[in-house]
């Protein structure tokens, strides 16, 4: 299976977002998605490693969404090697090809979960936030705690003890202020009150 026959070969790499050109990725990561800034009338990406190939057409707004099953098959083939990414775009009746860029697939695994606080950019809606975990192999996001359960207060600065998911702490402000320590199924609130004032802690470290 091949991509289109190009009428014109371009000199510059495609303008994509996020900029995934020539990066190293971990094995067994969820399919990378990117958008072609100028998709034209049609766009196609050809991913290949050795004899393993997959071809995906972009959506109308230029986004490439790679099927998970085919992606995982290609990724398994490419561990410790490179995936060649070739992007084509059609403008009217003319196919254009961009130079190939690479994704190097590391043989070294990384932790399967990321944890982060999710809040609107610019903090305009700080009263709607939460701390979430994302499984990097399938990109599923699940909440650890959302402030819809705590009167829409501010929560921040979560930290795990030596990357142990069973032991962490985070701070809350406004309603229910304080520092909370989770140890397995146990939750403890630290008493940080000095006199009549609750001292808000920041930037924890184990």
Regions found by a protein language model. Give the residues of each.
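Sequence signature of WD/YWTD-type beta-propeller architectures
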Residues: 1-206
């Amino acid at each position: 299976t091949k991509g289109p026959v190009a009428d014109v070969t371009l000199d510059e790499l495609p303008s994509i977002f996020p900029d995934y050109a020539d990066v190293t990725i971990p094995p067994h990561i969820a399919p990378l998605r990117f958008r072609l800034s100028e998709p034209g009338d049609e766009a196609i990406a050809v991913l290949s490693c050795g004899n393993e190939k997959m071809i995906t057409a972009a959506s109308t707004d230029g986004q490439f969404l790679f099927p998970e099953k085919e992606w995982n098959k290609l990724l398994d083939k490419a561990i410790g090697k490179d995936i060649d990414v070739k992007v084509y775009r059609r403008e009217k009746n003319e196919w254009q090809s961009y130079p190939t860029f690479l994704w190097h697939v590391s043989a070294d695994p990384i932790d399967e979960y990321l944890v982060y606080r999710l809040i609107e950019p610019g903090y305009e809606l700080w009263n709607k936030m939460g701390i979430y975990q994302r499984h990097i192999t399938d990109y599923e996001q699940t909440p650890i705690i959302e402030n819809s359960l705590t009167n829409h207060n501010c929560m921040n600065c979560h930290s795990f003890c030596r990357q142990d998911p069973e032991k962490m702490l985070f701070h809350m402000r406004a309603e229910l202020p304080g520092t909370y320590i989770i140890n397995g199924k146990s939750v403890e609130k630290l008493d940080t009150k000095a006199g009549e004032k609750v001292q808000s802690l920041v930037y924890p470290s184990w």
